[in-house]
Amino acid sequence: LFRSLRGSMPDLKGFHTQEVELPGKKVFTLEHYNGRNYNTTVWSQYILFPQQSGKLEIPSITFEGTVAQRVASDDPFDAFFNGGSNYIEINKNIVTPKLVINVKDLPTGKPANFSGGVGEFTISSSINTQELKTNDAVTIKLIISGVGNLKLINTPEVDFPKDFEVYDQKIDNKFNLTREGLSGNKVIEYLAIPRLAGNFTIPHVEFSYFDLKSQTYKTLKTEPYTLKVEKGEGNADQVIADFTNKED
């Protein structure tokens, strides 16, 4: 049984890697492999997102360990010289095999607005108001939900009217790491301020991704919004302050 084990994941070229958080205390279970019994545990686990096509290599990893080995002896002096134990500690290296993964290109026919998303996703939107005064703030919230490479996708753009003052978007990632990738939500908030009165339309937002189940590209759309802006003395200072203080 291993008393200690030391090793680290090498640099994986061509991959974006994320480590799965595992319990600090390792639990060993008995497994039968190739005619022998082994005490096994999951030492570390990573989710890999390939960033290029072709043959990508996961190098061999060497773990340095200290193993408790039982001493098969009837001589009581052996236990005495081993500190009263029937086990001795020996140093042992474990070498994992090198792996080569063949990564295919995505199919041709990518939509012009392809986000880089690969997985299964949905998108929804909401707006804080559709009737406001000049210099008031309007905020649109997009939520991209699903399972896949959520952290790596390009966020959609909202096409505000040209007379609106537009602020940098704020992103809140709420992910859980699973064997299938990242599961959860990417929440994007957009803030803009109309400087002129009038009726305006904010077009629908498109989000295109590659769907793993159907092996096809899919494009999702939100609803468009119509805004009625009246001339007035709106004040967006507090809304702007709250928005800009949010962490990306």
Where are the regions that the model predicts?
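Surface-exposed interaction/ligand-binding surfaces
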Residues: 1-248
